[in-house]
């Protein structure tokens, strides 16, 4: 496995997606280009390009380029970017929809944004790129919880500490401050932590949840419909549909959530699965479920059937990262090399695995 350390400020990187066609990369002298998101910045400052000089060996020739955007009047109102995906000429970015490790949930993390890939190609010149930003105000939280209820998925029970910190405290805050989103978080809800996203062949957005997981510790994916409406109408409510379970990833002793998603076409996906939260960092989820910190990071592959309306699917394991725990994104290039972004102290790690 080839290894490269890149320095960005801030240095908390999540997810990875391929960007630009062959002609665009050639114009800049690159043979590979990816976008990642930095979770300690607002949406307009969360993007970075990771690019590789044409002809350089895989463990050399990488450069990180910060990208700054203009979200109009919503600057500075968002945080915690965790997922990115490319579709139909746009790069989509999602907030986690979650909260601090000690709670409560925060509306600043409930958003989706996009920039045009064509505009992103001009970012190395230093100009801010236009950004469409939709502040969801727990609308996606509501839609995902409703979809999980309709699918009758048995979830890992929400423990008493997590319920108090993430659900009860959020409801109380919304009521006390008369927030616009008051009522969208219900007492029977699960907090959701979105850390992966990708698109199905028909254009539906596929969310990968780090939390919650099933009662047996398996990761969950939820489809989002009518994505365009969220950008056309600031008051539009997200709608979610099919729910999928990766039935052979994770288990009751080492539950696993999704950390990254990638597709090279069709409904075949590469994914990173791993622990529900980082151990040793006072995460409330792990106070209730200590086993949630046990799962290794793994690269897996799976395929979603075209006609089924959700349900359980199988996967195959590509790579187990062992003690390397903070693997947060995967993208497979045209040559079959799997690239991973690693959230490491003080720098952003990029690893490349040459697949057989």
Kindly label every feature range from the protein language model.
Residues 1-356:
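Sequence/structural signature of beta-propeller domains
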């Amino acid at each position: 496995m080839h290894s490269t350390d890149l320095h960005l400020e801030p240095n908390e990187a999540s997810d990875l997606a391929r960007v630009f066609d062959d002609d665009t990369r050639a114009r800049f002298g690159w043979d590979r280009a990816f976008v990642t998101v930095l979770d300690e910045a607002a949406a307009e400052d969360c993007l970075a390009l990771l690019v590789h000089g044409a002809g350089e060996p895989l463990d050399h020739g990488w450069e990180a380029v910060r990208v700054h955007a203009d979200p109009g009047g919503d600057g500075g109102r968002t945080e915690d970017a965790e997922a990115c995906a490319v579709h139909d000429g746009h790069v989509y970015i999602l907030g986690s929809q979650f909260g601090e490790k000690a709670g409560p949930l925060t509306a600043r993390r409930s958003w989706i944004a996009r920039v045009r890939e064509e505009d992103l190609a001009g970012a190395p010149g230093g100009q801010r790129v236009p950004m469409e930003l939709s502040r969801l105000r727990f609308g996606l939280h509501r839609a995902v919880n409703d979809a999980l209820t309709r699918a009758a998925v048995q979830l890992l029970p929400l423990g008493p500490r997590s319920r108090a910190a993430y659900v009860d405290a959020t409801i109380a805050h919304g009521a006390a401050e008369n927030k616009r989103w008051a009522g969208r978080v219900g007492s029977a809800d699960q907090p959701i932590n979105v850390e992966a996203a990708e698109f199905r062949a028909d254009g539906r957005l596929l969310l990968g949840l780090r939390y919650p997981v099933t009662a047996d510790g398996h990761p969950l994916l939820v489809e989002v419909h009518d994505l365009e409406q969220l950008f056309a109408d600031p008051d539009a409510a997200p709608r979610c549909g099919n729910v999928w379970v990766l039935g052979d990833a994770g288990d009751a002793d080492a539950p696993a959530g999704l950390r990254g998603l990638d597709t090279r076409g069709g409904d075949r996906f590469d994914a990173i699965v791993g622990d529900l939260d980082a151990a040793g960092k006072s995460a409330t989820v792990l106070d209730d479920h200590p086993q949630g910190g046990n799962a290794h990071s793994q690269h897996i592959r799976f395929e979603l059937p075209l006609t089924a309306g959700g349900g359980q699917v199988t996967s195959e394991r590509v790579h187990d990262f062992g003690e390397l725990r903070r693997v947060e994104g995967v993208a497979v290039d045209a040559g079959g090399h799997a690239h991973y972004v690693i959230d490491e102290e003080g720098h952003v790690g990029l690893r490349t695995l040459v697949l057989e």
